[in-house]
Amino acid sequence: MATQMVNQATGNSLFCTSTYSSISLDNDMYGLHDLSKADMAAPRLIMLANVALTGELNSGGCDYTLEGERQMAELTTVNDNSFSDSEGDRLEDSPTMDIQSRNFTMDIEPAECSKEGTSENDGTLLSNTLEEEVQKDKKAQAPSTTDDKIKCVKSKPFRCKPCQYKAESEEEFVHHIKIHSAKIYVDNDSKKNPQGKEADSSIPEESDISKGPIQCDGCGYNTNRFDHYLAHLKHHNKAGENERVYKCTICTYSTVSEYHWKKHLRNHYPRILYTCSQCSYFSDRKNNYIQHIRTHTGERPYQCIICLYSSSQKTHLTRHMRTHSGEKPFKCEQCSYVASNQHEVTRHARQVHNGPKPLTCPHCDYKTADRSNFKKHVELHVNPRQFLCPVCDYAASKKCNLQYHIKSRHSGCTNITMNVSKVKLRTKKGEVGDEDADTNKPMENGNIINRSVGKKLEETVKAEKRESCVKAKKRIVGMVDGQVAKKSRLSSTQKKIKASEVRPEKIVDKSRKSSFVKRKTDVLENPNDTQTSTLKKKKLKNARIVNTSEIKYDITKKLTGSVNKKENSFVKNMHKKKTGAQSSNGKKNMPNKITEKKEKGKQLDSKTSVASDITEEQTIVGKVANENYSEQVAASEVASSNVNSDSSESCCLLNDVMQTDLSINTTLETEVSTDHDTKSEHVSKAVMALVMQRDTQMDLSMLVDLKANFSKQEKTQDNLLMDIETISSDLLLQREEPNQVLYQNGIPNKLLREKCGAIADLPVDGAKTTVNLQIGKANFCFQNDCCQPDNLLVDGCKPMELREPSADLLMDHGHPSSDHLVGRGRPPYDHLINCGKSSRDPCVLTWDGEEPTCNKLVEVDEPTSNKLVYSNKSICIQLVGGAEPTKVQPARDEPTSVQPAAAGDEPTRVQPVVPGDEPTSVQPVVPGDEPTSVQLVVTRDKPTSIQTVTVRDEPSIIKTVVAGDEPYIVQTVGDEPSIAQTVEDEQSIVQTVAAKDEPSIAXTAAEDEPSIVQTVXAMDEPAIVQTVAAGDEPTSVQTVAAGDEPTSVQPLSREDPKSVQPIGEDQPTSVQPPGGDEQTNLLINSKTAYLPVCTKEAIGLSVARQDETELLVRRENRSVLSTVWDEPTDLSFERNVQSMNIPIDLSTTNQNPICMSKGMGCPLHLPVEWSEPFNLSMDMDWHKPANLSLVEPSDLSVRKGDSADLSLNNKKPADLSVVWGEPVDLSLGRSEPADLSVGMNQPAELKMGIPDTIGLLVEGRQLSVLTMGRGVESFDLLMGRVDHIDLSVERCEPIDLSVEKGIPRNLEISEGKHFGKLDNCYNLNCAAFQIKDQAKCNIIPENTSQSNTKLSVEIAEPHNHLQSMCVPSELHGNLDTTVQQSKHNECNNGTKEVGTSQLPCAVSRCVSXDEDEGIHSHDGSDISDNVSEMSYDSGLNGVPSVQKTLSSEPKVVINSSETKESFVCIFCDRTFRKEEEYTKHLRRHLVNVYYLKKAAKDIDN
């Protein structure tokens, strides 16, 4: 390598521009021009030692003039990235570029030329000062040739490391370098001489060969690294200007530091040379040599005590430990940025403070100079970080990265359960819309749309918005005989856009229009045909909808014209004469009441308005979207044309919509006529408004507000969401006067759902709703009748919710016109009813991923009795109302409506009530943020007509009878329904308060059954309340849960209502006060109960498939039920539930931890399947398990939360079976676990008997005890330190710790392994150790404890580099070690034991890492870049060609201690004892002699 680099003739220069083609670069002697492109591209260390050069370079070769002093130059890393990444940037350039020398001229030939110039960067990258210097230099230069005028284009720009300036040509870069260089150091004699012919003849000696263009004015120190120059100036500041300058007598190196000067001199005169036996590496530093050897052996002695990180260098471990401690000692000098290492600070300064940022993100305005950060940023656009950490704000783009983050950063959090499927996508504002727009808009030739088009479109939209508000009354669509008028006018702004833009192609042809009209007429002829309607809506369901609420200006002119033209044609088709007196001013100006019509004809009024704000809505782009858009218009027109004035026609319309896979998912926006402000909430962003109204003469009118392009539709997996905004005095058909149907401030509760019973609806007055339609599978089939409600066929049992601004109202399948609503607060499948169970069993809400099969036909008949009959039994009545009682008068023959209301933050269920001829008193209770309280009073004195609801083939569930003169009161506080069942002819007062978010059910059994009271109320889990009334005694159950109020449950007797006693068989009960932060359990002997789960006190359960989980929870805050009326419950002591049948849901899908209470006090191993409940019934064996063998490896916590893998070969689990109930103790001193890892990530093999235990306890300087077997035979191993025992073995068999007669079978450690740590501790570095089985003297008797143990250690084979064996002083008198060394040919024949009292190895401590790294070779070494981190000088290097001759010779390690030597070096006067060492050392100096002789020959020639 030396000969390749030094003996280089002139040729192509690194800088191949035309300006400096004939410049004599006085310091360019590295011959970089002859390197190939591959060598320039890949980083390559070209480090040569002792290259003695003096004199001048000419075109023929290297000429040297020896003037009494030898000059030495260093060659360092050369590649085209050397200016940014390499530590040894060597760009040689002098400010005196005008010095001409005929012998020092290089003819530059362009290597790779291109016609494209780089003149564009002249005005942006260069300052005015540089441009002036360029012009001056051009005048002083000789004219260049035509070939040199062709500029060369480099693959990567030239980069100035001090300021990160980049240039694409030599001209720019060379002049930029002049700015950073100081004045050239010139001797006093050279300063007097003019820069003319004298300068040509004799160049100053100090400036002949410099290390870089940056030079110090005071001492002449020169370098090419700006940070070295700044460090050099600090020496001047400390010692003053008169500080001594140290210069090298061999080369031009100079410094103000004596330390660095001596360090540099050792590069020329090395004393000790360490050579590698496996490669050609050599170094004069022992620590560098040791680090290089570890690259061959793979040894990593520096291991992190927190995680599994290990390193071969101490500096790397120190840097790694800062990631755990958070220490950031390095600070940026220009700002407050801090980092854990200097490299991060340097990169920060390069990116933020220094130089240009040429890397620009194509997706946004982000700019940077760091390529790694640039790639990470672009990846966020392509692959966003959608995996969010549940603990901190970290986000990852890959699941594995998030798992590694949680394991490394949050190892102490054991209750973290990450479910990636539920992780939400986190995106920036505006990025989602941009990405969606980019996927749909056609990009031709990669052009980007002008923002002017977007601005013009925005102005057009604003004008359209104003016109739509003013002319809303005029745009009413009239549908007569199924035909639509197509005549309308364009607005002025639309005409401007149409005239200014290119006319797009026609989207819909005549044949398409004719088929469109044909489909409308077919629907009119047969509106009840489900198949025809379904087929026509297929494309509507699968249409591609684009979310354009966040799209900014990304639409082409052509597409803009298409959208506008389609919009205009849409207005033409939908405009018609105004036929009614009703009108609306648009979505934002809708009145609270609509003028009622008094005419008795059959008329239909429909109103269409164009989208008011396109910037907030979605745009359908592309031809396919336009086709889908036309089909959506057709569907809406067909739906509008199907509406008649008759009630049957109204049902037909809804039937048509329902049969087209409509699963209505609505959100109500209620405007209540009280002092409360109007609340509105828009779930979707674009809307089709469908308004229905019917007056006293049964006139039905519909106002349809179709937004342009159905812009705000949202497409889910198989569902298409559409919003409908309605205004109605009463949503359903009424025959009575509307003023009698007043339900102001009413807040409906959630529907009581039991199996698939039909539910009636409450009338609503003055409600403004936004209906969110979700198109799903066909679930409903209606049989319409003008006088009776429709027959409802429920398929799928999907619950419906009404969404309020502050609550979600769940509705069951009722009348089709009552808008079955599904809230967005919770997925529909969380509330599905399993209809396959019996009626007596409580309905468990489960979801197994499939639609439940429940097809029940429900018939709703007219009221016939004073009971609400449900399969010949009574059903309870429940209402949720406002703050004041309101009289409700429902229609006798008409279905009732539903009033939306706001209560709480969760969905609310509504119980339908159909009173009779007299008004029913409804008292709504709205307690702030607490669940809504509803009280329904049905008095005996007034006749009450209750509608009968009959379910075919369904068993009876609930029965309610009003008897006597006392009222029957049902009071419910909460968002979930309650069921009360009592016995006939008896007074029953049931007050139930359910916890938030969960249903509470109070049920009773038949007569003459024992009375049992059970109440369970908990968060996030279903609860069941059962009440059984015996005989003729009244029963009262009261459960109160409101905020932090105490809970009390009292079963009342007939004689004394206040005498309460918990009912159960020797089992006291406990009740959790719902709404608080504490969890309690109601544990009563019953057939079925649910164990509540508390999210704050429960044990964290991390469940995987076929894992065994230990569930042991000891409750601290248990309580006893109070027996005094209206007093808080005492929850003070503990109860167990082992005598109950408790089905416990251990599902982890909702990430809820599991809480179990078990009275035995022993761990319970429960195999838990993923997302499947586990039944802890009474039949389960609660005794000692027969087999405790683990299915998976044990989870032994090591190093702050990490788990130790004790599996064998990662396939079979380790056998850690011990005495039942006793854990295995593997802890060490300071609570640190033992490190039992074996080899390269291979687990240890631990074999023990069932009663065996292991104790490895080390405390302070005490003896560690290893206890195994039944007989308790102990080995006492003296430990001088508290450090953990490292039994790591590499490339060796697993360690067998099984015990036979008190002695381990084998304890082998492969070559290069050791006990303890390498850093500042005692090192035992030998080939192999084996405890001999024949050492009978080491057997320890039973039941005896000795403080010391003698070990016989045998060295199986010698180690090539056995240097020292360090043993603590305590072991010198106690450890008897038998050491035997033998040669390679004697290892197999047996060895001879030599008994000694101490180890025959030298005792010494490890030498600390020296900052001086000295001479070392980088060939074959992976640590070449790391060993020079703390050094300014890279040192000397070996020549591979010279070392090849030594490869066959035996390698002899040079000891650190010097002995008498007989061979004296002629260069450095060193003496050597062996001739081999002397020869090796002498050849090191001959490298310089070779170049000196070569230089002398060149001079002679």
From Swiss-Prot:
Bias (Polar residues): 1067-1079
InterPro entries in alphabetical order: Zinc_finger/UBP_domain (IPR050688), Znf_C2H2_sf (IPR036236), Znf_C2H2_type (IPR013087)
Subcellular location, record wording: Nucleus; Cytoplasm
Swiss-Prot/TrEMBL keywords: Cytoplasm, Developmental protein, Metal-binding, Nucleus, Repeat, Repressor, Transcription, Transcription regulation, Zinc, Zinc-finger
SUPFAM superfamilies referenced in this protein's UniProt entry, alphabetically: beta-beta-alpha zinc fingers (SSF57667)
Zinc finger extent (C2H2-type): 158-180, 214-236, 246-268, 274-296, 302-324, 330-353, 359-381, 387-410, 1463-1485
GO biological process: negative regulation of DNA-templated transcription; positive regulation of neuron differentiation; positive regulation of transcription by RNA polymerase II; regulation of alternative mRNA splicing, via spliceosome; regulation of osteoblast differentiation; response to hypoxia
Chain segments carrying region Disordered: 186-209, 491-514, 569-612, 885-929, 1040-1079
GO MF entry, a single one: zinc ion binding
Biased composition (Basic and acidic residues): 186-200, 498-512, 594-605
Gene3D superfamilies: Classic Zinc Finger
Predominant localisation class: nucleus
GO cellular component, one term: cytoplasm
Domain characteristics, as noted in the entry: The C2H2-type zinc finger 5 is required for nuclear localization.
Role this protein plays: Transcriptional repressor which binds neuron-restrictive silencer element (NRSE) and represses neuronal gene transcription in non-neuronal cells. Plays a role in the early development of the nervous system and is required for proper patterning of the neuroectoderm during gastrulation. This involves the correct speciation of the neuroepithelial domain and adequate development of the non-neural ectoderm.
Name of this chain's protein: RE1-silencing transcription factor A
